A protein has these predicted regions:
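C-terminal structural segments of small proteins and small subunits
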Residues: 49-82
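Short flexible/disordered coil segments
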Residues: 1, 31, 66-70
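Amphipathic, hydrophobic secondary-structure cores in small proteins
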Residues: 2-5, 9-22, 26-50, 54
């Protein structure tokens, strides 16, 4: 199943978004952003399954948690989302 990576600047932001998602019934995980996806050094990503991606985006926005970039991971490839 395709997954989305919501890239954030700190582990604290990632954990806050993770908590909000879990409270909303969305299963997510926090990981170091895969190497090569960003040029900003160390960052973290909140990984969410495709059906829950729009709600996770909304939760980040509603709670003023800045998402730097978003990527779709499918068939072994990362595709940046607008």
């Amino acid at each position: 199943m395709p997954k989305y990576y919501l890239v954030v600047s700190s582990v604290t932001t990632a954990q806050r978004l993770q908590k909000l998602c879990r409270e909303a019934g969305i299963s997510v995980s926090v990981v170091h952003t895969p190497q090569g996806l960003t040029d900003r050094g160390c960052s973290y990503s909140v990984v969410v399954k495709e059906p829950d991606f729009p709600r996770a985006q909304s939760l980040a926005s509603e709670n003023q948690l800045p998402v730097r970039q978003q990527f779709l991971y499918q068939d072994g490839e990362y595709i940046e989302c607008p």
